[in-house]
Regions:
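Glycine-rich anion-binding loops and their surrounding alpha/beta cores
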Residues: 1-136
Length: 136
């Protein structure tokens, strides 16, 4: 629903399933604004080249990334596979946060909690409180 109003009808069923569906991939690709630049994460490795190819054919510039432990974000606990899309083509790169001097953190150290806990942590970070989560 964030990217295309027509997909809002699938939202209740997707939420009830509680797992990733094809709509996780279709959503960003169905964006009616047709962005010329995009950065999008995918959790399933098999979808990375598909999404990169679609973006390349559309003339988009951007990145399709996946943390190599299977998250749809750039990882701080391991390397990430990044498809860089530009000029109608894409190339695959590995991103290692330690190459930038960022200390590796186990995935367990950055996993949030329930909504109440996450709000508490966000408020602490915005208030300037220092700590492990604030340093991410």
């Amino acid at each position: 629903p964030k990217f295309h109003p027509a997909l809002r009808h699938a939202a209740p069923a997707r939420k009830e399933l509680g797992v990733s569906t094809i709509f996780n991939v279709l959503g960003p690709l169905a964006n009616p604004a047709k962005p010329v630049a995009i950065a999008v994460g995918v959790a399933k490795e098999k979808f990375q080249p598909i999404m990169a190819e679609v973006l390349a054919r559309r003339g988009c510039e951007g990145f399709v990334f996946r943390g190599d432990e299977g998250i749809d974000e750039i990882s701080l606990s391991t390397t990430s596979t990044v498809y860089q899309v530009s000029d109608g083509k894409y190339r695959i790169e590995k991103f290692d946060p330690t190459n930038l001097g960022i200390e590796s953190s186990p995935i367990e150290s950055i996993v949030g909690g329930d909504a109440e806990y996450n709000v508490k942590v966000a408020k602490e970070i915005f208030a300037g409180k220092e700590g492990q989560l604030a340093m991410l």
